[in-house]
Amino acid sequence: MPRAVNGTIHKNRRRRILKDAKGFRGARSKLYRTAKSAVMKAGQWAYRDRRAKKRDFRKLWIIRINAAARENGLSYSVFMNSLKKLGIHMDRKSLAELAFNDREVFNSLVEKIKVAG
């Protein structure tokens, strides 16, 4: 009986790694061993950056809200605290969207805060 060498399984594994390495530069997309390590490292970076992306967007939203609030004479912390006290429950993403794209609505929120406080 001939020796079984897992031909199709082996070939499919190599094909999948080389497919995932498509677009990498040089040997990283051609040679299995270097492609395998490049794909593993790319996976680590992707895992890390999926988490960093959430932090980065939150930072961006806070910067945008702060800039728009300061144009109206409030700091970010005073603005957010006043919203909380007034019972206006809006997340930072939607506040940043208002500050960036719909300044009139954002300014009306600021006026509401100034009237109340």
Curated annotation (Swiss-Prot):
SUPFAM superfamilies for this protein: Ribosomal protein L20 (SSF74731)
UniProt entry keywords in alphabetical sequence: Ribonucleoprotein, Ribosomal protein, RNA-binding, rRNA-binding
InterPro entries for the chain: Ribosomal_bL20 (IPR005813), RIBOSOMAL_L20_CS (IPR049946), Ribosomal_protein_bL20_C (IPR035566)
Gene Ontology MF terms in the entry: rRNA binding; structural constituent of ribosome
Record Gene3D superfamilies: 6.10.160.10, Ribosomal protein L20
Superkingdom in the source lineage: Bacteria
Protein name (database record): Large ribosomal subunit protein bL20
Gene that produces this protein: rplT
